[in-house]
Amino acid sequence: MTTASPAQRKVTRPRADALRNRERIVTAAREMFTEFGPDVPLDEIARRAGVGNATVYRNFPDRDALVREVVCSVMDRTSEAGELALAETGDAFEALERFVHTSADERISALCPMVQSTFDQNHPDLEAARERVEQIVEELMDRAKAAGQLRGDVGVGDLMIVVAQLSRPPAGTNCGVNDRFVHRHLQLFLDGLRAPARSELPGTAVTMEDLRRPCD
């Protein structure tokens, strides 16, 4: 078996400080995209991350690449939270609840407009991250339904819409103020998901395919 030489490994494996810089850039970009939107200057992101402009461009050649990495990293963390919830052996609905609250903290809804307007939504990295999240959410919901704890007339799309709407500040309101109420309102919604259902919902359960269908 041929083993890579130290020189080869040095070329192919990023240094620890380079990885830390990349992580700092992604973290700063996520915070600033959430606070100020997609047009925040990259030099401002570099300043918050504590790195030079050249370091930002060395890691991300353009804004689209940085936005994509931010969205994928948020989805990856959301998936990791979902996998932890799936690994729980206790109450299935409580596991779903914990996952929903954790997902809201990621503030992915604030990034959705950037995904829709700045680059290809079908980029392989983005599709893979999105499919992983959707599969995990479906498994969590199916498990709660099988336990008789989640009403049967809701779909993955229903859950995703509400998490997105409740974790995005209403127009004209302060972002920080809204954060104080997100989990309160999410819990109100989650209580309405419990079986048995107390009312009949209009329409049919919303799927992810429904959300991707173009508006007429």
Predicted regions: what they are:
Residues 50-60:
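Short hydrophobic/aromatic patch on the recognition helix
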Residues 37-38, 58, 151:
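Helix-turn-helix/winged-helix DNA-binding modules
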Residues 69, 76, 80-109, 122-125, ...:
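Hydrophobic alpha-helical connector segments
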